[in-house]
Amino acid sequence: MQLLCVFCLVLLWEVGAASLSEVKLHLDIEGHASHYTIPWTELMAKVPGLSPEALWREANVTEDLASMLNRYKLIYKTSGTLGIALAEPVDIPAVSEGSMQVDASKVHPGVISGLNSPACMLSAPLEKQLFYYIGTMLPNTRPHSYVFYQLRCHLSYVALSINGDKFQYTGAMTSKFLMGTYKRVTEKGDEHVLSLIFGKTKDLPDLRGPFSYPSLTSAQSGDYSLVIVTTFVHYANFHNYFVPNLKDMFSRAVTMTAASYARYVLQKLVLLEMKGGCREPELDTETLTTMFEVSVAFFKVGHAVGETGNGCVDLRWLAKSFFELTVLKDIIGICYGATVKGMQSYGLERLAAVLMATVKMEELGHLTTEKQEYALRLATVGYPKAGVYSGLIGGATSVLLSAYNRHPLFQPLHTVMRETLFIGSHVVLRELRLNVTTQGPNLALYQLLSTALCSALEIGEVLRGLALGTESGLFSPCYLSLRFDLTRDKLLSMAPQEAMLDQAAVSNAVDGFLGRLSLEREDRDAWHLPAYKCVDRLDKVLMIIPLINVTFIISSDREVRGSALYEASTTYLSSSLFLSPVIMNKCSQGAVAGEPRQIPKIQNFTRTQKSCIFCGFALLSYDEKEGLETTTYITSQEVQNSILSSNYFDFDNLHVHYLLLTTNGTVMEIAGLYEERAHVVLAIILYFIAFALGIFLVHKIVMFFL
């Protein structure tokens, strides 16, 4: 259907001065004409500050045909629209019956009783908060002014720049459509601009004559379209380094749910960061595509909320989606220094904080996995309004402790557990990055457990995920551990040797893993540990094990001012290994804690399953050639029994040693196990031998008299 609208502005002269008293509208739709007269005073009441002169200039109805034709020729036209049949998912689930409906502008304590109470947030107030800012969506600059009328509206945006201001990207969005604009200034000072517009076809902004969307649309499926707006000259310039796969970009944007799409983009950014793409970003197809996809991730959440109209949005969906956006916002801030304005609801943040106040954080680990993840997402989303930080990190630690206690020794994390711990890690990351964590035991325990979970098999699984680009590379406890001994050669020795893994990909995975463990990262700093002040050079530290009342600092030199100093020099052949216990966080007064002590050996270590005599202790294993292998924190009798009843100790391998670190600062090497029930077994054997010997003697005596 072709629509022809002609606005006639009638100027009435009063007392020698021009004033606009009314607007007459003639509307002709396929031969059916209608006429409307709108009093100007009424129009001004609806749209205050509207200037008739500005409207007249913007309409540009006096433009001659030659100028219009020239403008039309400058704008890039697609060779044809790619039509794709795509399934559009139902993103926001139906609200449960009896759900509490919450107005984002009226959140208060007690509005929801707890995590078990179904709840939703009214769409209209929520959408208003997400798109709170007013700005220019469609600017009066070329090439946009050739194609669109100016548009100022409520919006949100993602903005970043590279090379100073020589390259800029802005992803501006309403709840209806997204416009991602690339702007590059060349060395000669020339400016090149290209925009990608994504949204429902019926909601895309109106075009100036003589343009129509079919000539600008690159891809279309059902309700959605992807449009390119630029000039032929600008397109040719961008095409030198930006050749996106528009079909794949469009297909993912349409078919993936908001949360899944945000996770997909997050994974791309994590891999990009690990490859050094944040420190020295390349202006290539991958980087520029990822920029647009970042803004699509934010848009899809806001768009989904807007599509519910006057309905209500399930709170669990909001927690999941905005958790992903929060994590995404953090990484683009770290990676590109990007700014995100809008797409934030103080009502949702307040509601999340109110709900978390009803949860006993220290008992979070006892809940089901689903409730743990829900609570941790709420904790991340509600962080700005939480007020008390230590409680949140206690919840993350409770979940990690529960997972650790039921996790098989030295196995890589399974998918569900990895996801739960990934969600919880962002409560910890935020506190570390914002420097709000005090010297409390929760963070020390969290990092100790993360260190214990960072086994050789876990490292191998993460390297496999990084090499293949799967989600297992997205998160590992190693990233938040207190292991500082992982060198490139050591990681290569732990990498899986599989035919399906390309060696170049494995090498890149190792480099990425090392980049993630960089000491320059805030989450890798040990400043919050009280014993940190006893370390003069962190680059010599191999591992830190914070136990109750004592922190063990394992290093390659003896320059740690601990309460004592142990050396494994008699067995550790390749390099020095020193263990410095810092008892009650008190450093030694001198430069070092005296001469190193030799570590005593226990040849017959009693194996017991009756009581947890080793609870609170740690076991540390190391190889004479490869160095530190892993540490195990004994948290419960179940963990202790699992260690003693498994193949944890391999005493046949004379190159591997096992050290027991106790809570009083003592270090012992376990060189053999003694079964507590061995004397019983020995007595039974001796009794059987004596019985057999007695039978034999009776037999001989009887035979002698026969």
Curated annotation (Swiss-Prot):
Location of region: Interaction with gL: 165-229
Subcellular location: Virion membrane; Host cell membrane; Host endosome membrane
A Pfam family matched in the record: Herpes_glycop_H
Membrane topology, from the record: Single-pass type I membrane protein
Post-translational modification (record): N-glycosylated, O-glycosylated, and sialylated.
GO biological process entries: fusion of virus membrane with host plasma membrane; symbiont entry into host cell
Highest taxon above the source species: Viruses
Function, in words: The heterodimer glycoprotein H-glycoprotein L is required for the fusion of viral and plasma membranes leading to virus entry into the host cell. Following initial binding to host receptor, membrane fusion is mediated by the fusion machinery composed of gB and the heterodimer gH/gL. May also be involved in the fusion between the virion envelope and the outer nuclear membrane during virion morphogenesis. The heterodimer gH/gL targets also host EPHA2 to promote viral entry.
Xref: HAMAP family: HSV_GH
Recorded family membership: Belongs to the herpesviridae glycoprotein H family.
Protein name according to UniProt: Envelope glycoprotein H
Protein species of origin: Epstein-Barr virus (strain AG876)
Gene giving rise to this polypeptide: gH
